[in-house]
Amino acid sequence: MKVRPSVKKMCDKCRLIKRKGTLRVICQNPKHKQRQG
């Protein structure tokens, strides 16, 4: 899980989701998991 000030899609399978007020990226590739911090 990467914590970043700006989250971006890294590939076509990445999905941006807002969960409990934080932006998250979920993807089939675990390296692409991110959350805005």
From Swiss-Prot:
Source species: Chlorella vulgaris (Green alga)
GO CC term, one of those recorded: chloroplast
GO molecular function (one): structural constituent of ribosome
Family indicated by similarity: Belongs to the bacterial ribosomal protein bL36 family.
Coarse class of the protein's main subcellular location: plastid
Protein name per its UniProtKB record: Large ribosomal subunit protein bL36c
Record keyword RNA-binding present: no
Classification via InterPro entries: Ribosomal_bL36, Ribosomal_bL36_sp
Compartmental location: Plastid, Chloroplast
Gene Ontology biological process: translation
KW Plastid (keyword) present: yes
Keyword field: Chloroplast, Plastid, Ribonucleoprotein, Ribosomal protein
